[in-house]
Amino acid sequence: MNKHNYLLSLVFFSMMVAVGVVISPILRVEGMCPMAHLINITMAVFMGPWYSFLCALAIGLIRMAVMGIPPLALTGAIFGATLSGILYRVSKGKIWAAVLGEIIGTGLIGSVLSYPVMTYLWGRTGLTWMFYVPSFLMGTIIGGSIAYVLLKSMSRSGVLENIQRKLGVQKFVETNE
């Protein structure tokens, strides 16, 4: 990655973190933050799994520090963001795979792992292992649907590939999805 691509990637990453923090309160209820899933999937497609993970981690930590929200901001984001990027890469650029990765990673894995975090570290009582699954799944489906429509339209117009090329990341040309 040359110096220009590195700087552009850093600026894009920073902008996505800022946008993620600012739009996260929109449509948010505890355990359901569709706008975070939109950012996770977008980052996974534009920059890959590790940048997506770091973006979700940064957004979660900032939201916890500034907005005083519980650790659900982390457990509900990092697994989906990472798996979204991995499945996008493994599928050779299928947007539906990135959305599916977010749904599985956050809606199922992250929601189940939120139980011990909230019970033992946060002191919440009366929870079950499946307590967060419905709200996490709904949040990821809503955010994933928005991301799919956005990224699919960008792919059709060629903007997605152009942005990926400018960021210097691995790009894929979608075919027959």
Give short role names for the model-derived ranges.
Residues 1-177:
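Loop-helix junctions at membrane interfaces
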